[in-house]
């Protein structure tokens, strides 16, 4: 089957155990290791939830690395890294960068919501906790108060800029994006983004909801007009764009996490077992702070028979 197609959870649940059991029985030691390049926003999701559950259920060992999705896909496309599995926080970006040369299919398995997390004891945090609209409080904040991700390295960064653009329209504040510049400071990685908030270097950060939950920080989700969590607003999101250094224009789109097993994977069977495990356990993914609507999982490209039967 090609193109975008829903795949029922029953299909995954019905055969997940068989595939995991088969691969667990014939792969041990180093051969059972699965190298995963994953979006940085999934660090705690995988380490605290998915990895222990998967390793407990199988003889496989995950070897995850975490990077911004733009960075990890570039590492694969330029031949620097050769993982078994890739997981991107932008499904379209994964297809654009990997299809044809490196992968033939992608499974979309989760969504997320954009917003702002904060330290309640800070001046900005107190205003947010008191109900001041985030954008008014942010404009008034001291310089370098709000950490944001680098748009050149990961989708969180360019979604933040797009959200600021859409927020300007939503709140009838045409200069909002420029007015927010003094208060924001760009960080080179998603891990540093929240580490600097936790250590008190910054009062807040624009993040995905699961990241705030991972770090036990209060989270204010942006409205549907610019949180990239409402599929019915896809056309509206697409009105915001970001242009990369190489001239590629990226349009706003709903947040969707996608994964694939690479064509040159060293452990194809293990990689497929891991992808099936993600699709077959939506409650585990939800417990980690991600959203799994009824529309997921879906896929692009022709799924391997082992994943589609």
From Swiss-Prot:
InterPro entries: ModA/WtpA (IPR050682), TAT_signal (IPR006311). Residues 1-32 form the signal peptide. CDD domains: PBP2_ModA_WtpA. Predicted to be exported by the Tat system. The position of the signal peptide cleavage has not been experimentally proven. One of its GO terms (biological process) is molybdate ion transport. Pfam families: SBP_bac_11 (PF13531). One of its GO terms (molecular function) is molybdate ion binding. It comes from the Archaea. Keywords: Signal. PANTHER family: MOLYBDATE-BINDING PERIPLASMIC PROTEIN, MOLYBDATE_TUNGSTATE-BINDING PROTEIN WTPA. Belongs to the bacterial solute-binding protein 1 family. WtpA subfamily. This is Uncharacterized solute-binding protein VNG_1595C. The lineage of its organism: Archaea, Methanobacteriati, Methanobacteriota, Stenosarchaea group, Halobacteria.
């Amino acid at each position: 089957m090609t193109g975008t197609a829903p795949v029922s959870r029953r299909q995954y649940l019905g055969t997940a155990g068989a595939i995991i059991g088969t691969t667990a029985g014939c792969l041990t030691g180093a051969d059972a290791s699965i190298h995963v390049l994953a979006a940085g926003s999934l660090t705690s999701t995988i380490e605290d939830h998915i990895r222990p559950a998967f390793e407990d259920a199988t003889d496989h060992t995950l070897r995850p690395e975490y990077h911004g999705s733009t960075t990890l896909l570039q590492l694969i496309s330029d031949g620097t890294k050769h993982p078994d599995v890739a997981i991107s926080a932008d499904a379209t970006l994964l297809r654009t960068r990997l299809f044809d040369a490196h992968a033939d299919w992608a499974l979309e398995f989760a969504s997320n919501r954009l917003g702002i997390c904060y330290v309640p004891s800070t001046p900005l945090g107190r205003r947010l906790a008191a109900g001041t609209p985030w954008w008014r409080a942010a404009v008034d904040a001291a310089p370098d108060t709000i950490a944001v991700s680098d748009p050149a390295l990961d989708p969180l960064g360019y979604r933040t800029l797009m959200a600021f653009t859409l927020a300007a329209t939503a709140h009838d504040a045409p200069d909002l994006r420029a007015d927010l510049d003094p208060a924001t400071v760009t960080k080179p990685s998603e891990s540093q983004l929240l580490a600097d908030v936790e250590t008190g270097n910054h009062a807040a950060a624009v993040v995905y909801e699961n990241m705030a939950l991972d770090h036990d920080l209060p989270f204010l989700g942006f409205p549907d007009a610019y949180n990239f969590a409402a599929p019915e607003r896809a056309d509206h999101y697409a009105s915001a764009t970001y242009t990369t250094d190489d001239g590629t224009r990226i349009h706003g789109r709903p947040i969707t996490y996608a994964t694939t097993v690479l064509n040159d994977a060293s452990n194809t069977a293990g990689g497929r077992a891991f992808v099936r495990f993600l699709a077959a356990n939506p409650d585990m993914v939800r417990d980690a702070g991600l959203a799994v609507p009824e529309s997921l999982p879906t896929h692009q490209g022709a799924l391997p028979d082992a994943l589609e039967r």
